């Protein structure tokens, strides 16, 4: 029987990441339906809708990372920056995923959020496959009202989405 090593979350760092709220001309927010991989933070949940997000590469500024991640995950380039959340927002993985998700290297994520306006049309959005040979993260997408977002995400990220909605709610009007 294989031995499992107990991981102490307090010894693990947060993964530095960016999150992106993309609003269309009607004030609706782009969300993608995640492809849930085994041993990911989405395994076993039905709440798989989320906004684009991703890691910050070494030497990369958060805004650069946001623009890169947006293109890698959605193909979108026709965007303009609207706002940056004032603070970094952290979340912790649930206990059963610590030591498993994120290859066991992180306790959760520390995210810097940006809001962008999308000026293109739906034909620009490419998720499966996304551009540049990247692995697909989403299998479908939708424009949703901002206030619905916290109910669409995995429960342990709900607080993050509540904070993001609070930071950017003025943009939906």
Swiss-Prot record:
The gene is rppH. Keywords: Hydrolase. The keyword Hydrolase applies. GO terms for biological process: nucleoside phosphate metabolic process; ribose phosphate metabolic process. It holds the Pfam family NUDIX. InterPro entries: Nudix_hydrolase, NUDIX_hydrolase-like_dom_sf, NUDIX_hydrolase_CS, NUDIX_hydrolase_dom, RppH. One of its GO terms (molecular function) is guanosine-3',5'-bis(diphosphate) 3'-diphosphatase activity. This is RNA pyrophosphohydrolase. A motif (Nudix box) lies at residues 54-75. Accelerates the degradation of transcripts by removing pyrophosphate from the 5'-end of triphosphorylated RNA, leading to a more labile monophosphorylated state that can stimulate subsequent ribonuclease cleavage. The keyword Hydrolase applies. PROSITE patterns: NUDIX (PS51462), NUDIX_BOX (PS00893). Belongs to the Nudix hydrolase family. RppH subfamily. Its cofactor is a divalent metal cation. It comes from the Bacteria. Residues 13-166 form the Nudix hydrolase domain. The lineage of its organism: Bacteria, Pseudomonadati, Pseudomonadota, Alphaproteobacteria, Hyphomicrobiales. Its EC number is 3.6.1.-.
């Amino acid at each position: 029987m294989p031995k499992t090593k107990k991981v102490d979350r307090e010894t693990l760092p947060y993964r530095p990441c960016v999150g992106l709220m993309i609003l269309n001309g009607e004030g609706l927010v782009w969300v993608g339906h995640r492809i849930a991989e085994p041993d990911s933070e989405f395994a076993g949940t039905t709440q798989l809708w989320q906004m684009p997000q991703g890691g910050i590469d070494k030497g990369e500024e958060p805004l650069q990372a946001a623009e890169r991640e947006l293109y890698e995950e959605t193909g979108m380039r026709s965007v303009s920056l609207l706002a940056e959340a004032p603070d970094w927002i952290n979340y912790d993985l649930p206990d059963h995923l610590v030591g498993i998700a994120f290859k066991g290297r992180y306790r959760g994520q520390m995210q810097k959020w940006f809001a962008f306006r999308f000026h293109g049309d739906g034909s620009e959005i490419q998720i499966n496959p996304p551009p540049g040979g990247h692995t697909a993260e989403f299998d479908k997408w939708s424009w949703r009202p901002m206030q619905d977002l916290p109910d669409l995400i995995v429960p342990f990220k709900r607080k993050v989405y509540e904070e993001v909605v609070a930071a950017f709610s003025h943009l939906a009007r």
